[in-house]
Swiss-Prot record:
This is Recombination protein RecR. It comes from the Bacteria. Residues 83-178 form the Toprim domain. InterPro entries: DNA_Rcmb_RecR, Rcmb_RecR, Rcmb_RecR_Znf, TOPRIM_dom, TOPRIM_RecR. A zinc finger (C4-type) spans 60-75. It comes from Porphyromonas gingivalis (strain ATCC 33277 / DSM 20709 / CIP 103683 / JCM 12257 / NCTC 11834 / 2561). It holds the Pfam family RecR_HhH. The keyword Zinc-finger applies. One of its GO terms (molecular function) is DNA binding. The lineage of its organism: Bacteria, Pseudomonadati, Bacteroidota, Bacteroidia, Bacteroidales. The keyword 4Fe-4S does not apply. HAMAP family: RecR. May play a role in DNA repair. It seems to be involved in an RecBC-independent recombinational process of DNA repair. It may act with RecF and RecO. The gene is recR.
Amino acid sequence: MIQKYPSRLLEKAIDQFATLPGVGRKTALRLALYLLRQPVENTRQFAAALVDLREHISYCRRCHNISDSGVCTICADPTRDQSTLCVVENIRDVMAIENTSQYRGLYHVLGGVISPMDGIGPGDLQIDSLVHRVASEQIHEVILALSTTMEGDTTNFFLFRKLESTGVRVSVIARGIAIGDEIEYADEITLGRSILNRTDFSDSVKF
C-alpha cells in the first residue's frame, strides 16, 4: 500500500531521511514530524551542521582518520607514542579504541579489509601508505586490530607478509573479541584488554 502524505515538502523530507542506514519510512516520518515541532532556528542549526560536516571534514593525510584540517588531532598530538601504529579498518574503530583509554599510540585507517567476494583487493585499501609510513617514520611496532572475521584474518596475514622484511614488530590484539565480531561493537573493557594482551603475529599463526 502506497503511503500518502498531506504535504509534498513533508514527503520530500521523508524520502531523504529514509536514505539513512537503518531508517525506514515510518521512522523517517517521525523524524520529519519531530523537526516540524522544533523552533525554526534549531532546524537551521541542524541543517547547517550537516552541510558543514559534508563540506569541511576531510581525511588526515597521514593516517586517513577524519580531520578538520590536513592532519587529525591524534597525529598532531605530541604526547602520543610516535613509535606505535595501530592498524584498523575504519574510523569507527579508531573511536572505539580511543574510548578504552588503553592506547596512546598512532593509527592507520585501511578503509576496509581484503574481500575478494566484494571485489576489494589490496590496491583498494591504504596498504601502500602503511608500508611507506613504516619505512619513513620511526615505527617500532604495528598492532593489527582488525575484525575477527575471515576477511580480517586474511588482511592481517597479508599485512604481516608486507611488513615482515622491515624488521618492525607486528602484533595482533588478543582474541578476547568473539570470532566474527567487529572491533567497533566490542565493549570497552574487552577491547582494552585485547590491546594490552596483544601478542606477536608470528606466534598466532602456523606457517
